[in-house]
Amino acid sequence: MASAAPINLRAQDTPYVPPTSLPTSSSQTGSTARIQIIDDEKKFTPDLATQIERWGLRDAGFSYNIVAVFGSQSTGKSTLLNRLFGTTFDVMDETRRQQTTKGIWMCRGKDMGVMVMDVEGTDGRERGEDQDFERKSALFSLASSEILIVNLWEHQVGLYQGANMGLLKTVFEVNLGLFGKKAQDGSNGRTLLLFVIRDHIGQTPLANLQATLTADLNRIWESLSKPTDLKDRLLSDYFDLAFTALPHKILSADKFESEVQELRTRFVDKESSDYLFKPAYHKRIPADGVAFYMEGIWEQVQTNKDLDLPTQQELLAQFRCDEISAVALAEFNEQAKSQKRPVEGGRVVEGLGAMMNNWRTQALTRYDRDASRYHKGVYGRKRADLVAVLDSTLSPLFLGQLKNLHKSCLVTFKKEMLDGLHGEDYDFANVFKRAREKSERTFSEGGKEALVEGTDWSWEEELELLRDEIRAVADQCRKDETTKMINLIERNLKKHISEPVELHLGKASPDMWDEILRVFRDTLDKAEKTYLTKAKSFNCTEEENTAALDALRKRGWVALRAKIDEQTADPIILGKLRNHFEERFRYDEQGVPRVWKPDDDIDSAFMKAKDQTLDLVPLYSKISPKDTSLEFNLPSESNDSFSNDDFDLSTSPVIFTETKCLDLTNKFRRDADAYYVEAKRSTVASIAQIPYWIYGVLVVLGWNEAMLVLFNPLYFAFLLLAMATSYIIAQLGLVGPLFQVTRTVGSEIQRQATARLREHFSQPVLAEPVQVGPSRDREEVGQIQ
């Protein structure tokens, strides 16, 4: 690439200075300031883009035009441009006749969206035989401009070198290489060659001059070496020709100015029929890419490489589209970054879909606005790349939003289920339906809102996952509610069978188990009906109902066995046996308590009551109803995870084993023997009472002592005092406390006396002999018998 060269706005009469040190003329405004884009050392300036922005054309898009002038040195090219477009190019000092324009300069037309290039003249004495720059500048001008103004004098028409026909031949060859195939496929690439014939005096009509130039151009075209596939192409397929004549600038100054203004109108008036800037001539390079495009062309020209303008346009398009895409993407990333943290934090962002659509639309709109002017293929590819990057940035936000919606809706569903299942009267199916519809509706609305237009994203798959989790949660809730319902039914069943079981076990009878099992079956049937009634709203399957009923039956049986085991524990069953024995031994058939007399047959009554009571032990030992239809058959298996098999189901009717029965029998026998001994003692006490005659003997023998007390004043006074004291103590209720105090004092006196005697005689403390109650009772029974 050519070395940088800054803006050069030097005056005509100042010596030439390299562009790097030339300041902008203070007499030029920013909109008409000129810039040397290529200096005489063939270096391209890096400041063209900045100058285009100063001209106010950077954002013009395609609403601009480029025109270049081509011709011999000192033919008034700069003057013509200044008159036509209001530019500020340096013009020649006619008194010195030296080169004015060096390199290529550019200036914006006054009040026009036109960038005008003033190209160094050909055939100048300064360059002499060096035609390299002439060819390169002609090639550069043709590749860059829409209209190439060929400036020549009238007397040069018909000449070959004087009319620059040799250079035009080079231009034609270059143009054929540049636009041959492109024009053949029907796309743009045409250029207008505007021949401005200067110093026209009118003797030779313009039409004749036009015919001469046209013939010369066609002859040159025919002499070109064309590729085989382009040999039939005509000059008119690539170039449009236009001709105009201007009178002498000095000899006919007024007419010259009027003709120039008329020619200017053809550049300005778009409504004019002979308007020169036709759309077909435009190179379709956006204004903001002109500097980069021209620099690329000049670099190719400088290195003598084959100049492929379509490739240059694509390279420019790639460069500019990448720049535009980067700017749009930077702002887009800043916008997306603001919502990244909330989404990653698990929060559902309200209106995220609208924001993402807005961000994406803004980025694409910004890209389309600035990049759509460039090469369509490159623009389309870069747009697709931009869309892919935008979507890859938004996709995590979209998926995160769906994930957060999923969690939120699942939490809402659980809450709705728990709230709906409170209370007594609820329909599980309705609660589940309302909660599910609400959660799915919320997720669907959020998923639709989060969807970005123009993408192939979908939220239906996530909705299916949510539905699966909702079903799993609902199944767990249904299982929990079913378990709660079974537990409640079980508690009610226990409550209803508790009292009847206690009642029937307390009054043992041969049909005791029939009554207990009948009550149990009735209660269990009611419990099963209650379950089936409530289970309808749970949408339970037949298998689930069967399993639940089996579990309920097993739980009911376990509850019954637990109650029976409670009522047949050792202390309780022995109490029942004692009560049964007492009712038959201590009471007669009418329920009157018996008072045993020596002549009563205690032994027979005892044996009868004992045998009847012992007959109850086998009755209590096994649940065995007389009516076999009342026997309860447990389910073979149960899926109830809340019950444990604490006993063997095959032996569950057995309450007492044979060993247990023998143990209970022995314990009861000992209790019964105690009752028998007690009865025998009561008869012995009645036999050993004091005879009545003893009381008469006591009166006779104690009469004198009684008289002594009664007739002795002292003794009688003490007797009265003792009687009065006893009466007062009895009236005040102090008899018991007095006896208690007396016993306490006596015990304390006895303890201290015993301790003193032990200390005195050093006698050891002897333990009381162990007395065995039952054996002693048996000895006493033997003695009595």
Curated annotation (Swiss-Prot):
Membrane topology: Multi-pass membrane protein
InterPro entries: G_GB1_RHD3_dom (IPR030386), P-loop_NTPase (IPR027417), RHD3/Sey1 (IPR008803), Sey1/RHD3-like_3HB (IPR046758)
PROSITE patterns per the UniProt record, alphabetical: G_GB1_RHD3 (PS51715)
Sequence ranges assigned to domain GB1/RHD3-type G in this UniProt record: 61-281
Main location: endoplasmic reticulum
Enzyme nomenclature, EC number: 3.6.5.-
Keywords linked to the UniProt accession: Coiled coil, Endoplasmic reticulum, GTP-binding, Hydrolase, Membrane, Nucleotide-binding, Transmembrane, Transmembrane helix
Gene Ontology biological-process annotations: endoplasmic reticulum membrane fusion
Sequence positions that bind GTP: 71-78
Keyword Chloroplast: no
Segments of this protein annotated with the region Disordered: 1-31
GO CC annotations on file: endoplasmic reticulum membrane
Segments on the Cytoplasmic side according to the record's topology features: 1-689, 735-785
Name the record gives this protein: Protein SEY1
